Amino acid sequence: MTKVPPAFDFSFLNDEEARKILQVLERNEELQRAEKDRISKLQKTKRDIRWLQGVTGEWFEEIQRKKFCNETDVSQMLKQPLTYRLSKEMAKNDPIELPTSRSKNVTNQKKPTPFSSRMSFRSSFASLFSFRKSGKETSKLPSLGQKGCDGHAGPPMPVRGAAVQAKIYNSPLENHLVDSTFVPKPAVMREESGMPPPWDASLLENEFFQVLDDLDSKLAQEQSASSVNTRTPLNYGSRTQFGHFYSSGNRHGNITERHKKHYNETSNMSIYDILRPGTPREGFKTFSPRTSTIYDMYRTREPRVFKEDYVQKNTFGSTSLCFDSRQRSALPATGHFTARSLHFPATTQSKSGFIPPRHQQSPKRTPLSSIIWNRSDSSRDRENQEEFLRAPSPMEIDPADKYVYPRGFQENKRYESYHSQNVYQRVSLNAPMENAMSPDTFENSENMPFYHQSNTFTRSFFSNTFGRSGEQRRFGQGPFWGQEKGHSFWSDFHRSRKSFSSSDRDFEMISMEANSVSAIHGHNVSSEHWESFSSGYGTDVSRGQEEPHPWQFDFQRSTLDSMVVSHGNETQLTPHFGTPNVCSMTGSSYHVKSSELVSQQDSSPVEVHINKEASSFGIAQTLASSFKTSFSQISDDRRNPQSPNLQNPTVTLQKIFPNKPASHPMRSHTEVTVTSSNSVDSLPLAKSQPNILVTEVNNEKDLNESISEEDKQLSKMDQTNKAGEIPQPVSQTGISNSLPDFQNPLSQDSAKSNGFGFNASTIISSKKSPRVFSRKDTSKMYIPHTDKSNDIKQDKRFTENRKLGSTASLPFIQEHRTPPSFPRTDQGCHQELTVNNEDISRIITNNHWSSALTDTQNAQYSKCKLTPGHKTSCDSLDLSSAALPDSSPSKNSSLDAPVVPSTTVFSRRSPSDKDPSLGEREEKDNAGKNQKNQFIVSHSENQERNDSPVPTHDEVVDVKCHSHSPFRNERGKGKIRHHISCIEKLSKTESISVPTSDHRSLIEANQSNSKVSELDTIYCTLPRKSSSFLIHGRQSGSKIMAASLRNGPPPFQIKNNVEDAMGNYMLNKFSPSSPESANECSKVLSDSALEAPEATERMTNVKSSGSTSVRKGPLPFLINRAMSCPSGEPHASTGREGRKKPLTSGMDASELTPRAWERIISPVESDSSVRDCSLTKRQHQKENFQEYTEKEGKMAASRRSVFALSNEDPLPFCSDLSGKERGKTLHKVKTTSTFSVSGDEDNVKCLEVVSIYYTLPRKPSKKFCNLLQQYTQNTNLLIESPQVETETFPNALEKDKQNYSTREQSGTPSCENLKMSVNSDQTLTTENMTAFRLSNRGPLAPTLQEMASVEAAVSLPEEESKAREIFSDNLAKTPLGDSENKKERGKKLQSETLHTSLMLQRKNVSEEKSENCQQSINSSNSGPSSLPALSEVNIGNSQTRRSSWECTGSGRAIPFTGSGKCPQKDHTSTAVGDGSSGSQPREGRGDIGTNCQKMTNKTLSHSESQVFALTPALHKLQLGEETQSDEPNLESLQSEPRELPQRSQEANMTESRKAEDEMQKSAWDQPSLPEGNKNKTNLDDLVKGENRSSVKHRLAAMSKASRKFPAKDVSPRRHVATIFPQSGSRSGFDHLSLGTVECNPLFPEPTPKSAESIGESRLSENGKHVKKSENLLPITVLPNREPSTHVSNQKSNSISQRHQNEFKNVSESPSKHENSKDVTAAQNLVRESGAPSPITFTSLREAEFSDNQRRLSPPFPLEPAQKSRVSSPLASFLQQQRSASSLEWEPEPHLYRSKSLKSINVHGDLLRKSHPPKVRERHFSESTSIDNALSRLTLGNEFSVNNGYSRRFRSFSELPSCDGNESWAYRSGTKTGPRSAISIYRPIDYGIFGKEQQLAFLENVKRSLTQGRLWKPSFLKNPGFLKDDLRNPPNPSESLSSNSPSSQVPEDGLSPSEPLNIYEDDPVDSDCDTDTTTDDEYYLDENDKESEL
């Protein structure tokens, strides 16, 4: 401050702003000094004078002097001339001149030079702009504007960005004011004048300004801050102006209101114009925030709006940093803005607290992305604008912040209301429009009175204020009332949604960006948001998609907003309430809460803040509040932040957090909504009715809680009522129930500790609300009331205990979500269902709400019965639907329950909370019950939905997916959103496969119910967005993590969480205080774990809060944004960020992973406890739970949880995909999100994605599409799977909880594992689930029982204990052994080691995890899909397979494999023992994930040496296990029969394992002698010299891989492999590693694989099912290993990598495991059973596997190897599978690939086997890899392979073209979006790659031989696919990077970087290939070479 000249008056600036300005000034001084130094140095050099002049810049000064000879000050000259001239030209625009002058002078006085410069530029342009409209506006503006400027914010604002802000604000205001009496600043006029008359000029000018702004910002700050400053000043000024304006008592509230109406109608675009002078009203949505700010400011809720707008602007229009800055500024500004600060001082705090997450995201180029080009149309059509915004959103979202930011931008209108919820969240997203809302949200408390007074109902009020401003402004529809109705209520709804929607929306934003409608639709939030928008402009889109209903609801609800209490519009209200729920919390809730709950909010600022944060957090305030205040509520709020974070990477923290917060906020803001909606009306109502509704609410909430039974009845009653008069009951019940629920549950929650679960529930509900949004009918109605209740309760809870809030919220949410619960169930079950529910919710809502509500009631009753149960049910419903994402974001945030949102969310929350074990167990029971009920209900509902919503389903699915994803990712969507897109796609795809889609919904619902946890886990897919967001968030900080957790998606996102990793981290830190805090802490821990040793500690905390963490882990979904959603919405956590930036684009993986971890861990614990039925114990042993579970048999639960974690992790990876896309992939994911969001129609999504693709999300797009598709289907599976996974993971989590490694491993590997598993499972499970869904339903209950009873848990713990102990003994040699033992014993050492490992690994893991995360992102991109799918698959596959395939027996083994690692294990387990198997597989998986993660951590930690130490142990373990498995498989090929014995064996198998280890060695020796020998040798070597061997091999592998593949590819991949394989490929890699340990090439990756294999082995030993899985895997491994070995060391290296990756896929990701085992199982089945059905499943699994592999595992070669083995049977079965897959899974691309894959698999396998090592090296890599890639492509795993062959096939961008297009949405979607970027990526490859890389690539291309070689060899095998493969293989490199953002993210850290990463990979590949690869290597064989030559 001292440096600022006295002339600068910063009085109007808040500290943050002043600080930023000072920073800029200081930087300016520094730069000047540096320049002087430089020049002085230059002058010292005796050189040519001309040269000197040129270098020193004297020439310029000279020119300037000549030009401005009379000007002494060059800077002044530079500034004045433009401004001066422009202003002079605009004599009329004297005001502008004045502001400009003032800007110059005042700016000089008050404003920093940079700003003044910028301002002056802006001003000049504004003048230019303004002067166009000067005639019209100048007259008014000069006086008014001057007056307004001077009077209100005159000097201060001008100081800030007087000209710009004035311009910006004036523009909208000007239109507004000119029309109305209000007078904005002249500067605004410039924009306004520019916007109405000169659109082109406006655009040009806007763009110009943006460019100048960006340049200025960059120069000034080189930070987002600069961007922030660019916009922040404007916003600040504007806000300040308005703040002063209002402060001065010059409240233009009335004017504002009027203006709002008018402005919304007329000046809607004006706002944007203000933001973007070029486009009136809509032209510049990017500037929308400013517009909103101005607009809002001028509205009654000006302070809030101002602040919110300010924040939003920052988030949206400005850089994220800007946003952050703004938000911070806003916070200080809030202080400054008297009205706001007076009304909502907490808001300021919230904002301040919230700002950091937002702060993290600062896309500098957001302005460009948000550039006018997207706005122009938008301005005309609000709806279109929103959509348009969404379309540009990908671009906008492209940057970290952009991701969020553009998203907001894209969803600006949608988010307007939303924004109010998530001021920064949605502000971030929809800074322009949303800002108005956001501020409302923020200012609801303070401005609530206004608005309240303004509108009879707060909702109406803030809807009008907020909605009008945000929404209607957004809509910009002439009929303000209609808009107001739609918007104000919508706003309310939006707001409610905002927190949730923010998260969801963020997710959706990603999705929405890709598929505006779809995304929005997919996002409940989005949907609701859409509805909000839809009401205005998005209605048609939404409506078109079944969102019309939601929209209609929204509309009516808008009206209802006013009439929250009115039940007449209850249907609408319900949706609106759903929205209000979401939005309520954020907007309505928040606002209403603010008004009604203002006291409550204030009373329980934590709750309110959480709500606010959740709501507003979306807006920084609530989040900040939550962050600060509620964090114990942090979990919730953090989720909120996470959700928003999920939603917005930069704002991701916020947006994703909102995503998470969406979850959390959903939770929170569901509560808030309840409070909000009922705040004024309902609060009293709620409070009045609380008791009455308490029962009802208790139905939902208390059902969850002690009122379980009462609530059962009430729930039924409620649901019946709701079903009967859903609208009214929803409204009433929702409100009353919610409130009572909140209150009752609050108490009860407090008592029951279900609060946490409820919190999750609330989050879920919140999320669910958005889901309900999707469902929007009753649900919404329901939710709002409930939300209000929830809000109140959450307030209480937050006040009391965030836990309770969560629990209460959950119940409440569930309750009010329960009526919508069923839709929610459906929705929850299937976020697709949610989408369906939106439609169906309307249709079926009434219809289904009767049945579904009843069922939901039932389910909810079950759920309610058990808080966890209810949570599970509700969460299943809610979480699945809204809760899942909600929970995912919210719960994930809190509970990390995105993956296992229901159970985990609830359970996790519960476990996290007080009664996790009980609740969880109940949840399990209920899950079983719910499973049955919900299954049935879900089924029927699904059927209904299928019937009714099938058409809608596409739309609904979109919404559902989005809901799903958004919730997961919600937060972030984004990645999660992306995920949601994928899900949506799948859903849409599953429109055809309605059973799949709807089934998925059903299964999700059912599974949600039956394995709510799993459902939650599925919804942990939320982390999809969350993941992305998480990753993003992680990058952002814990924001994404929060988002991830929250969204789990939005996925927290994980993305959100990750993004909020820091924020969330803090939140988590805060969280620890409360259960939710613990959850949050867990999340944070997860984040931290990912982020750092801190995370390790936190991980421990998380482990303690493991539930949360676990949930978080699973949640990791965001992050892919589903936010993003999944793309890279949030950069998610640091770890995730490392990963998710790599993931998000690394965030998902990284952050998601952490988040997934956290989520997963939390859910694991929660779920484990619940599932284990040791909930109580679990509670006791939350920390001990890991050990205890292990010992108690919680291992199964833990394992399941872990699996959930794994599932969730993949989701995070999916999220990561989102996150990756969000981060790096962020852009991609955006595209992907958009792409995926389109639904199953890849084209639509592709289009959107393409938009994003160029942004870099294409890769994610493809992958995401795949992912989403798989996710959609897999979500169903995931629903089932989550339970198992949850249980499985809990163990792993448990173990890993203690061992941070677990989290890391679990998070990273597990996540990836899950991701892969999910992918694989998704594919497989989709079919399997579809096929076995019914079966599953039945089995699901048993599975749930298995999980719940932990047959597996007990037997698993027993077996696992034994296995672990024995294997621990085996592993005792290695850290793994210790780890195992420790895990067994609750080994601290491993924890410590892991901690150390984690710490060390943290770096490695951060990098690798980044890579991993990137892979994860890929996976996560597919992950969210995958994870949910995996979860579902794991649950579904595990359970379905277990039940279905159990029935099949051996055949089941394949399904088991299909489950992925866990699913495979599950399957194996299933084969062996139904219950045990199911649980154990999950457990095994979780363990594997955990172990893998642990291994990964350890590996990373021990830097390879420990990993290798672990790896050897793991290898040994896995070898033994795999040998056992393999041997039995190989020997008997009776995986199931053998597995059964083996399962029995597993207990004994530890010993047997060693024997079998030997046998396996033998077996392996037999199948793959080279590898077998290596296996033996390697096993011994690994065990003995794993470290040495590992390092040596790793180095060798690296070198060889480098040589074989681009070093980059290898290196990142190796890291990925190390991280990923450890987690996912441990088993496979174990074999590979063992097989290839000596074959170093494999080992580096193999070692990770080894680690993973070991992890799996450990899991195996942990769980017999794991062993079985391992058994299956061993066969798989055998083939993999065999080919790998056959391939040769070099090849092995490549293969090793591939193998690892494949194994990562197989073992790491269920997919890979699945595929391996699938193949094995398929073989077994084929041989044993010979039944096409099992093989079909195998095929499915394989397809899934392939897909996952493609997505997740670059080591497809191994897969093909294994596939090769099963190839013959598999070929035929694969076709069947494809057919089945195609039908159910919609793997048409996969089907297509499948056939190819069969061919290629066989081919590749044969090739691999037949090729000599050298040939194999290159050729294998090429051919096998290609084949693998082909198979992967075929199966949807092209990416993995492509990753490997990035460079090699880079020259053949066209090669993947075919697949790329086909696979784009699908594969890329599946993989990570970055792959999607393949097509676009190709060009991007050329363009984005460094010259070095480009040259290398070109070199490769130039090498016609190389090209020919690449083409010829593979082409000979599979010409078409080879191309794709080749092309994809390069992509797999990327994909790997994508998939394992670790590889990409570490290098790039962001999705955009992902391409860079790919480039790096490519260059390495190219270099390696070019440099190290001999010509021979290029050829399949010498003949090829010769023939080619």
Swiss-Prot record:
Region listing for Disordered, in residue ranges: 93-117, 348-391, 631-651, 806-827, 882-933, 1094-1113, 1124-1152, 1365-1493, 1521-1590, 1644-1737, 1921-1989
Q: Which UniProt keywords apply?
A: Epidermolysis bullosa, Phosphoprotein
Biased-composition ranges, Basic and acidic residues, are 377-389, 910-927, 1379-1390, 1551-1560, 1573-1589, 1658-1670
Q: Modified residue Phosphoserine is at which positions? A: 603, 806, 809, 1028, 1086, 1124, 1505, 1753, 1768, 1821, 1851
Instruction: State where composition is biased (Low complexity).
Output: 1416-1431, 1933-1943
**Which InterPro entries does the entry mention?**
EXPH5, Rab_BD
Q: Which PROSITE patterns match?
A: RABBD (PS50916)
Question: Where does the RabBD domain lie?
Answer: 7-63
Return the GO cellular component terms, semicolon-separated. Answer: endosome
Q: Where is the composition biased (Polar residues)?
A: 100-111, 359-376, 641-651, 891-909, 1098-1110, 1434-1447, 1685-1709
Tissues with expression: Expressed in keratinocytes.
Q: Name one GO molecular function term.
A: small GTPase binding
Q: Which GO biological process annotations does it have?
A: intracellular protein transport; keratinocyte development; multivesicular body sorting pathway; positive regulation of exocytosis; positive regulation of protein secretion
**Which residue intervals are annotated with compositional bias (Acidic residues) in the record?**
1959-1989
Q: Which disease is it linked to?
A: Epidermolysis bullosa simplex 4, localized or generalized intermediate, autosomal recessive: A form of epidermolysis bullosa, a genodermatosis characterized by recurrent blistering, fragility of the skin and mucosal epithelia, and erosions caused by minor mechanical trauma. EBS4 is an autosomal recessive disorder characterized by mild skin fragility with onset at birth or in early childhood, associated with acral blistering with hemorrhagic crusts. Skin fragility improves with age in most patients, although mottled pigmentation may later develop on the trunk and proximal limbs.
Q: What does this protein do?
A: May act as Rab effector protein and play a role in vesicle trafficking.
Note the subunit structure: Interacts with RAB27A.
Its name, as the record gives it, is Exophilin-5
Q: Which organism is it from?
A: Homo sapiens
Q: Which gene encodes it?
A: EXPH5
